[in-house]
Amino acid sequence: MDKLLERFLNYVSLDTQSKAGVRQVPSTEGQWKLLHLLKEQLEEMGLINVTLSEKGTLMATLPANVPGDIPAIGFISHVDTSPDCSGKNVNPQIVENYRGGDIALGIGDEVLSPVMFPVLHQLLGQTLITTDGKTLLGADDKAGIAEIMTALAVLQQKNIPHGDIRVAFTPDEEVGKGAKHFDVDAFDARWAYTVDGGGVGELEFENFNAASVNIKIVGNNVHPGTAKGVMVNALSLAARIHAEVPADESPEMTEGYEGFYHLASMKGTVERADMHYIIRDFDRKQFEARKRKMMEIAKKVGKGLHPDCYIELVIEDSYYNMREKVVEHPHILDIAQQAMRDCDIEPELKPIRGGTDGAQLSFMGLPCPNLFTGGYNYHGKHEFVILEGMEKAVQVIVRIAELTAQRK
């Protein structure tokens, strides 16, 4: 474990923030730097079949050290950090033996407070790695990368029995492109785990069904003084549309297994307005109902408009709930839960109120639930990770490999 923290600090020093709306994959040059570094490290460790695709997917194999027909399994993390917050010049703070209370982030006004983040009350005595209040930390998902790399080293150094272990590091997960160019056949694993979760013990195999809704509103602009019966204000139509969306089904009003409608952006003038929503729901029928609801709202608001004025709505599915694919292979979850218990961790099965590469990979034929990393408050200045949690994640990865080798 001695190199776990060193690896993590090394990885977060590289700015790998991804960028939405970019055609190329990876979307940023910084991701290539980390991918090339990891490729070099994997080769130095003696892994075989180390490949880096033109779309930035890095794969490698730790060969089995025991004979027999042991299923090849995989571990996957992503190299990019969220576009929501800067990942440049990350300056981590290490708080040893946390004793409670506020933690000053750098020399500014930002603090990490248990008043806002009550989970801190449960972390007394542990080592926290925080930001300096100016950037995100990058534990999502460089904690996962450091944990996988350290687990590979532990498996090698301690000669722990295992089958073929496949690892992959992907780009652009945060902008929804991480799995689109993933070659499942080349990866050649029976199943895999993304290491991209949160607090210790989290095991996730359910995620949102997700869709995006883009609404284009075309109005008619004339001088306000002579507008009666002629002007069609696109902004007013946009306001009417949003007023029809259930206010109590927004992200800030929902939790657990509850779905939502989220107005992510809105811009415009009298003549033209654009709205972007995302729709999320765990239940497939409710998911489809939410999409129908948006179409009904657009029809209702657009009824009776002049032919030159219109509301155009485009709905595009993003990903689906991987639960239906993972539950077909219950041993995948059984092994992960047993591994956690063997490491004195009580598994906490909870839904992902978001998505992971694993969701898309599960529908591409690679069942892929999500393991914890020990990180919290992703995508912002209050992000932090627990060193002891990272160490536990390494132990669980190693134990999963060991338990799989026993399932001959």
From Swiss-Prot:
GO cellular component assignments: cytosol
Please list the residues that bind Zn(2+) 2: 140, 174, 379
One GO biological process term is: proteolysis
Annotated binding of Zn(2+) 1, by residue? 78, 140, 196
Note on cofactor = Binds 2 Zn(2+) ions per subunit.
Q: Which family does it belong to?
A: Belongs to the peptidase M20B family.
Against NCBIfam families, the record matches this protein to: peptidase-T, PRK05469.1, PRK13381.1
Protein's name according to its UniProt entry? Peptidase T
| Organism in which the protein naturally occurs | Shigella flexneri
